[in-house]
Structures are given as structure tokens and as C-alpha cells.
């Protein structure tokens, strides 16, 4: 049984296509960026510290609110309308925000986002909360977006992250349900060059059985990748960690709870130690710790926060019979 993924809302088109076109007018006070071009702004951007938020859902939003005061937020999403809506909320709360479109499964698109971010100032924080879930996509698409896409984000932003910068990648409790991999498989997921990652034998269609399996191995791969990238990021004086949330009440989670695996998800909640699902704000609190000065000794780590569901899966009422 998988945990509810943390990416929110289905993409408006299949990842891998070109960057989205610029849409209608943006909210007042918000700059829109696409293909690294600023097309609308209310004034010169003077902020020098930039927080990049990839994925306009409520989890990325919750972390951003806690770490972005006095900084410039670059909010990127596959869907421009999602980015605009989230940016308006942040702007209304007093944050300075730009928006951009990004397809994390495209190196060209991720690189363009990096160029946009560095043109705004020093990238001091990255929040990667984009992805697709087992109910949204095929195994191949999940691997391309959730596994390869995360590797691209870590690689590209690892080249420019500022000293004392930090990154949080949203993984999932699902990665903790996958049986143990071999040391060789762990190393392959952690260190294979991004553009060779999807050619690994363990990721071929005859090995990845279904969308749930693809999601679990992608999320396990995220935490392994972050551990390896922490070495490289550390040489720049920066940190990177993953958070593996369980069932967090987001729009996507509510879709999952009413979907074909909904009964299983509800049982997870019922038998967990916490006896409830989580909130984006709770994930935001952990994200703020990891990205802030109090988390300065934490890097290359994965934080499982699922109310005890994984504990119940391995050692409690959810344990496989």
C-alpha cells in the first residue's frame, strides 16, 4: 500500500512537451516569467536572495511562506494558471513573487528555470514539490517526472546554489514501503548521471510492474539521490534534504481518498499512531527547519512524517500477512 503522493493536481498536458505558453494577465504585483523572459512586472526587482518553488501546490506554498520573507519567490509550475493562482495568494500576503512555467522532465526547461532564477539574484533556496502520482500517470511517465525530473532539478540547481543555501525535495512515505534494494541498486539510483538514469536495467518495463511500483522506486530514488547530492552541494557550502510525508490533506490527497485505493488510504489513517492525516502546514514546519539556520547541521537526510503509518505497515496492523 502506498502513501498519498505529495504532488498536487494533474498536469495540464503530458510532461516532456515544450514549455507552456504565457496565459492571460497575472495578478497585480506579480511578475510572470516564461522561457526565461519577464513579460509583465510592476517594477524593478531588487531582491537579491531568491527562493525557487517548483510545484504550485499547497505543500510547496506552506514551506515558501515560512522561509521567503524578505526574499524574492520564483514560483514555477507546469500549469501557468496554477502558478498564477498560488502567486496571487503569496503576493497578497506581502511576498514579492515571479512566476514561470517548467517541465521538470525536460533538461532544457529546468535549465531555463535556473537561468531565470539566477537572473533575479542569488538562489539561496529551492523547494521541489512537483510530480505525478500513481493515479495520474503511467509507470514510464512517473519515472520520467518523479525520478529523472528530480535528478535534473538537483543537478541543475546544484550548479548555482548560493553558499549557505538549502533545498528541500518532497518525496513520500511510499519510498519507505519498497523492500530493501541491493547496495548496487542503491548506488545506481543515487549516482548514475541523470541522463542515463532511465536506462538502468532495474527501471525497464519488465522490472517496474505498475504505476504504484514506479512511484515507490522513484521516491526511494529521490532520498538516495539527495544523499549523494549532499556531498556535491556541501562543496558549495549548501545543504539538501528530503521530506517523506504520508497522507497530507491536499487536493490531490482528497482525489486519492475518493479513488480506487481510497479504502486502503482511509485504513492507513485509522490504524496509524496519530489517527489522522497531516496538513500542509505541518510539512511546512519541517521544511522551515531544514531550510533555516536551526537545520544547519542537517544535510543528506530524509525526514519521514506520516503519523506512524509506515511503522504500522512494518510492525503493526498494516503489516503484510
What are these model-predicted stretches?
Residues 48-74:
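Canonical Rossmann dinucleotide-binding motif of NAD(H)/NADP(H)-dependent dehydrogenases/reductases
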Residues 71-85:
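Conserved glycine-rich Rossmann-like NAD(P)H-binding loop of the short-chain dehydrogenase/reductase
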Residues 90-108:
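Rossmann-fold cofactor-recognition segment
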Residues 127-134:
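Conserved NAD(P)H cofactor-binding loop of Rossmann-fold oxidoreductase domains
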Residues 134-136, 163-235, 247-248:
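Catalytic loop of short-chain dehydrogenase/reductase
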Residues 152, 207, 211-215, 220-223, ...:
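C-terminal helical subdomain
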Residues 245-255:
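Short, flexible catalytic-loop segment of classical short-chain dehydrogenase/reductase
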Residues 299-321:
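Short C-terminal tail/terminal secondary-structure segment
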Amino acid at each position: 500500500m502506498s502513501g498519498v503522493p505529495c504532488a498536487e493536481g494533474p498536469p495540464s498536458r503530458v510532461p516532456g512537451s515544450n514549455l507552456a505558453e504565457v496565459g492571460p494577465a497575472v495578478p497585480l504585483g506579480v511578475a510572470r516569467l516564461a522561457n526565461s523572459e519577464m513579460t509583465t512586472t510592476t517594477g524593478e526587482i531588487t531582491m537579491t536572495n531568491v527562493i525557487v518553488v517548483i510545484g504550485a501546490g499547497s505543500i510547496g506554498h506552506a514551506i515558501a511562506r515560512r522561509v521567503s520573507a524578505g526574499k524574492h519567490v520564483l514560483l514555477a509550475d507546469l500549469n501557468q494558471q496554477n502558478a498564477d493562482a498560488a502567486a496571487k495568494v503569496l503576493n497578497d500576503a506581502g511576498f514579492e513573487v515571479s512566476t514561470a512555467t517548467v517541465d521538470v522532465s525536460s533538461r532544457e526547461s529546468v535549465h531555463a528555470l535556473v537561468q531565470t532564477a539566477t537572473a533575479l539574484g542569488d538562489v539561496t533556496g529551492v523547494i521541489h514539490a512537483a510530480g505525478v502520482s500513481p493515479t495520474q500517470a503511467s509507470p514510464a511517465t512517473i519515472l520520467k517526472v518523479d525520478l529523472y525530473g528530480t535528478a535534473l532539478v538537483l543537478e541543475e540547481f546544484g550548479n548555482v546554489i548560493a553558499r549557505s543555501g538549502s533545498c528541500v525535495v518532497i518525496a513520500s512515505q511510499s519510498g519507505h514501503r519498497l523492500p530493501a534494494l541491493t547496495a548496487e541498486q542503491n548506488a545506481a539510483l543515487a549516482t548514475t548521471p541523470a541522463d542515463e538514469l532511465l536506462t538502468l536495467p532495474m527501471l525497464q518495463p519488465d522490472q517496474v510492474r505498475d504505476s504504484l511500483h514506479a512511484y515507490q522506486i522513484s521516491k526511494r530514488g529521490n532520498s538516495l539521490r539527495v544523499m549523494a547530492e549532499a556531498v556535491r552541494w556541501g562543496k558549495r557550502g549548501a545543504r539538501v534534504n528530503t521530506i517523506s510525508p504520508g497522507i497530507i490533506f491536499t487536493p490531490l490527497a482528497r482525489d486519492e481518498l475518493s479513488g480506487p485505493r481510497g479504502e486502503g488510504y482511509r485504513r492507513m489513517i485509522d490504524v496509524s499512531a496519530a489517527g489522522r492525516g497531516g496538513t500542509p502546514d505541518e510539512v511546512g514546519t519541517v521544511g522551515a527547519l531544514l531550510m533555516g539556520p536551526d537545520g544547519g547541521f542537517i544535510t543528506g537526510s530524509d525526514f519521514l512524517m506520516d503519523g506512524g503509518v509506515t511503522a504500522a505497515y512494518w510492525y503493526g496492523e498494516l503489516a503484510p500477512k
